């Protein structure tokens, strides 16, 4: 007997035959198209779709959106002020409600809202329309105005300029020795010059008197020399006497000797007579009775039994040597007799000249005063109290500065952005108003005797400026800058960097000094912005 083969579904999987859900064979039986469903298999559940959903307790609830609300188990419209529902359940506007207000150009008259329109507008069949006027006639321009390519321009002469969109006259600049103070132009004069009755005149130096042996002749000073002295090639030298030697004396180099003949000899550096049956004496020896004498000629003499050189005025014997005798105003130097010069005298081209004394230099200090107010701005807001002094001594200018923050800059953090404080000066060394530390603050010269600020400009202010030839291009000095070091007792991670930038010019400035604060990320936390005293030096400007 053959066994009947069961038919299998088309998607039957003989390896995993348990994926397809099996219909429940247990009551109650249900139809999933009439509100019930099986979820999960073998479990009877209510078949719902949005806006129906289940609450956390498993109850069926209605999800509501904007404008709807459940009230006392009923779904209602969520209406606001000025709206209501009528007896038919329709949403209407309350007649006496002031929930809707209208402002000009809208107006409400009874149940009608209207729009007020002005000139250039019109209502055309319920549509707002703009009435465009007819185009105006083309513009004509007469000199000095000119039009080219739709642009109107104004030609300028050399004396005119446009600054920030405004027409003005170019400022007149003055080069040394001219200077401008207030509304006047003056001429700076140095030693030896003066201005008298509006005219530049030379100041005559005081008359110089000369004492012997100096002698003034016309515009030169000369030295009178006596016997034994002479001026050769502009130098004072001693002239030895013209000594001649006659036989038996003879000169060999620097030595004088006596030639001896018969009956004489030199023994032990002495002239002695030798035994001779007959002695004869030749000139300059002379026999007088039993004495033999030496006849000394010009320039020689016998003194104390010795033959010596006869010396005249200005010459003397010193240790067996003929030497010149010098008086006041002369000295020996390198085997020559020279004039002894005091202060204010020098030798030039062999002549003694008076030297004009060098002018003394008085140090100059420009500063903000000992305790300035908040005098520096960042982004237009005054927030930095800056103490700055510039001191010119000799050829160098020393910069001393310290800075304290106020307001939003009272403290800084590691994320603080870099910022700069800029001083800009004109050609006379006067502080301009174009920097963020400018001439509207206290600035001027410090007197020697007190701590005030003299704001009246002086020609010496230029000496405190950076030398434009040395710093023809911008130069910088970078130094570490401690913050609030006294309070933190020099703790680490409490310093930033400060860069002094010299002559980074902009605009009309002739000299600039820029203090740039950077590298705030070196701080470990927020810190009071109160810098240590910073010191810089640079080469000062010429007068």
Swiss-Prot record:
Tree of life domain: Viruses
Ranges where the record places region Disordered: 1-36
Induction of expression: Expressed in the late phase of the viral replicative cycle.
Location(s) in or outside the cell: Virion; Host nucleus
Predominant location category: virion
GO CC entries: host cell nucleus; viral capsid
Keyword Endoplasmic reticulum: no
Annotated GO biological process: adhesion receptor-mediated virion attachment to host cell; cell adhesion; symbiont entry into host cell
One Pfam family, short name: Adeno_shaft
Record InterPro entries: Adeno_fibre (IPR000931), Adeno_fibre_knob (IPR000978), Adenobir_fibre_prot_rpt/shaft (IPR000939), Adenovirus_pIV-like_att (IPR008982), Attachment_protein_shaft_sf (IPR009013)
Domain remark in the UniProt entry: The tail region anchors the fiber to penton base capsomers, whereas the shaft, built from several repeated motifs, allows the knob to protrude from the virion.
Note: All late proteins expressed from the major late promoter are produced by alternative splicing and alternative polyadenylation of the same gene giving rise to non-overlapping ORFs. A leader sequence is present in the N-terminus of all these mRNAs and is recognized by the viral shutoff protein to provide expression although conventional translation via ribosome scanning from the cap has been shut off in the host cell.
Self-association and partners: Homotrimer. Interacts (via N-terminal tail region) with pentons.
Protein family according to the UniProt entry: Belongs to the adenoviridae fiber family.
Record's function text: Forms spikes that protrude from each vertex of the icosahedral capsid. Interacts with host receptor to provide virion initial attachment to target cell. Fiber proteins are shed during virus entry, when virus is still at the cell surface.
UniProt-recorded name of the protein: Fiber protein
Organism: Canine adenovirus serotype 1 (strain CLL)
Upper taxonomic lineage: Viruses, Varidnaviria, Bamfordvirae, Preplasmiviricota, Tectiliviricetes
């Amino acid at each position: 007997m053959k066994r009947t083969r069961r038919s299998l579904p088309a998607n039957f999987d003989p390896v995993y035959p348990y994926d397809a859900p099996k219909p429940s064979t247990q009551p109650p039986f249900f139809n999933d198209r009439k509100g019930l469903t099986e979820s999960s298999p073998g479990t009877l559940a209510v078949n719902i779709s949005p806006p129906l959903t289940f609450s956390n307790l498993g109850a069926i609830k209605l999800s509501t959106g904007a404008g709807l609300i459940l009230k006392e188990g009923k779904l209602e419209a969520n209406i606001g002020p000025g709206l209501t529902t009528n007896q038919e359940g329709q949403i209407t506007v309350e007649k006496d409600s002031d929930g809707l207000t209208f402002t000009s150009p809208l107006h409400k008259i009874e149940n009608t809202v209207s729009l007020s329109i002005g000139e250039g507008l019109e209502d055309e069949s319920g549509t707002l329309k703009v009435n465009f006027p007819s185009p105006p006639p083309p513009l004509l321009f007469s000199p000095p105005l000119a039009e080219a390519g739709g642009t109107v321009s104004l030609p300028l002469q050399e004396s005119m300029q446009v600054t920030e969109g405004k027409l003005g006259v170019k400022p007149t600049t003055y080069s040394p020795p001219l200077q401008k103070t207030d509304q006047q132009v003056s001429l700076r004069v140095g030693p030896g010059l003066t201005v008298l009755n509006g005219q530049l005149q030379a100041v005559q130096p005081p008359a110089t008197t000369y004492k012997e042996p100096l002698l003034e002749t016309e515009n030169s000073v000369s030295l009178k020399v006596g016997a034994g002295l002479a001026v050769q090639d502009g130098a004072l030298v001693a002239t030895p006497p013209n000594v001649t030697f006659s036989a038996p004396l003879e000169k060999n180099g620097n030595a004088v000797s006596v030639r001896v003949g018969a009956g004489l000899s030199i023994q032990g550096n002495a002239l002695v007579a030798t035994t001779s049956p007959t002695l004869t004496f030749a000139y300059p020896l002379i026999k007088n009775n039993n004495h033999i004498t030496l006849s000394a000629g010009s320039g020689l003499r016998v003194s104390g039994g010795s033959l010596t050189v006869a010396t005249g005025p200005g010459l003397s014997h010193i240790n067996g040597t003929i030497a010149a005798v010098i008086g006041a105003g002369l000295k020996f130097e390198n085997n020559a007799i020279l004039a002894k010069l005091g202060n204010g005298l020098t030798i030039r081209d062999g002549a003694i000249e008076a030297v004009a004394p060098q002018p003394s230099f008085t140090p100059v200090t420009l500063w903000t005063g000992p305790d300035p107010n908040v005098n520096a701005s960042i982004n237009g807001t005054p927030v930095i109290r800056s103490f700055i002094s510039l001191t010119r001594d000799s050829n160098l200018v020393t910069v001393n500065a310290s800075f304290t923050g106020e307001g939003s800059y009272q403290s800084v953090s590691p994320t603080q952005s870099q910022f700069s404080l800029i001083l800009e000066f004109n050609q006379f060394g006067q502080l301009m108003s174009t920097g963020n530390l400018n001439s509207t603050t206290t600035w001027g010269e410090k007197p020697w005797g007190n701590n005030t600020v003299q704001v009246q400009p002086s020609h010496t202010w230029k000496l405190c400026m950076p030398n434009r030839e040395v710093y023809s291009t911008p130069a910088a000095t970078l130094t570490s800058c401690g913050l609030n070091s006294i309070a933190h007792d020099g703790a680490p991670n409490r310093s930033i960097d400060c860069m002094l930038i010299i002559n980074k010019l902009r605009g009309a400035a002739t000299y600039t000094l820029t203090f740039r604060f950077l590298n705030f990320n070196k701080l470990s936390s927020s810190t009071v912005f109160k810098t240590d005293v910073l010191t810089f030096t640079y080469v000062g400007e010429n007068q």
